[in-house]
Swiss-Prot record:
GO process annotations (BP): GPI anchor biosynthetic process
Domain of life: Eukaryota
Protein known as: Phosphatidylinositol N-acetylglucosaminyltransferase subunit C
UniProt keyword terms in alphabetical order: Endoplasmic reticulum, GPI-anchor biosynthesis, Membrane, Transmembrane, Transmembrane helix
Length: 297
């Protein structure tokens, strides 16, 4: 049955109520029925370059995984001396440690209450225990086939990327799980290296690139966005160059992946905003904005 429209008379006006009898048909739709309808009043409008900037967090983690795998391949092939990697990683960690304090003027350290002596002790304890257990790490998975080790490493690195904290407030985010999966992947790959020294340095490098490096990048992003963009570009080109030295096809696919995430996906997101339709009105559920904590104590 088609809806019938009846012109309101000055004497009787239609009201949006159910508890009064009105002289209108049941299927009557007044012209003022949707006058309180609002669309997209709380919708967030994204800007293209802002989305590109935020996508750099994903780029950073993809490059970290790529660099880690490239370094492992070089060590496995005997093209990279473990002593050189350890020295370079140690020097880079010292530079990053100094920058971490200089970026915010030491405010983060004051808030956390952690001293440099405590950091030094933690570092020495970690290096000592990792070096002591490196023979165990080297022989931990000897009974497991190499194909299984590689499959486990790939699975763990994918899990690291999935559960990593990219800044989104989601239930799937778990920084602890993400880091543990990355370390487990490093242990799996380190067990296939020639010597225990290689395994020790590989696990140490994994801590540096998967635990310490994201902390520095997060602070760079918050305090010096331009420097953060420059470091991200340099890191991406380094990862691309390292992968190119191993496989040209893999490097091209990796570059296409980075381009899609940083350029095409933000453009697609901006384009989808045209189709966003969130409606609001008096039918919305009531929201209690008053602080009710005093009633719960």
């Amino acid at each position: 049955m088609c809806a019938q429209r009846v012109t309101d008379t000055p004497e009787v006006k239609w009201q949006k109520v159910l508890y009064e009898r009105q002289p209108f048909p049941d299927n009557y739709v007044d012209q003022r029925f949707l006058e309180e309808l609002r669309k997209n009043i709380y919708a967030r409008k994204y800007q293209y370059w802002a989305v590109v900037f935020e996508s750099s967090v994903v780029i950073q983690q993809l490059c970290s995984v790529c660099v880690f795998v490239v370094i492992w391949w070089y060590m496995d092939e005997g093209l990279l001396a473990p002593q050189w990697l350890f020295g370079t990683g140690l020097a880079s960690s010292l530079v990053g440690y100094v920058l971490f304090d200089l970026i915010d003027g030491g405010d983060g350290r004051k808030k956390s209450g952690r001293t440099r002596w405590a950091d030094l002790k933690s570092t020495l304890v970690f290096i000592t225990f990792t070096y002591g257990f490196s023979p165990v790490l080297k022989t931990l998975t000897e009974s497991v086939s190499t194909d299984t080790i590689y499959a486990m490493a790939v699975f763990m690195l994918l899990g690291h990327l999935i559960f990593f904290d990219y800044g989104a407030n989601a239930a799937i985010v778990s920084s602890t799980l993400s880091l543990n999966m990355a370390i487990f992947a490093s242990v799996c790959l380190a067990s296939r290296l020639p010597r225990s020294l290689h395994a020790f340095i590989m696990v140490t490098f994994a801590i540096q690139i998967f635990a310490l490096w994201p902390m520095l990048q997060k602070k760079l992003k918050a305090y010096t966005p331009r420097s953060y963009v420059g470091v991200t570009l340099l890191f991406a080109f380094s990862a691309f160059g390292g992968l190119l030295s191993i496989s040209a096809v893999g490097a091209i696919l990796f570059a296409l992946l980075l381009f899609s995430i940083s350029c095409l996906c933000p453009y697609y997101l901006i384009h989808l905003q045209l189709f966003k339709e969130n409606i609001h009105g008096p039918w919305d559920e009531a929201e209690i904005k008053e602080d009710l904590s005093r009633f719960l104590s």
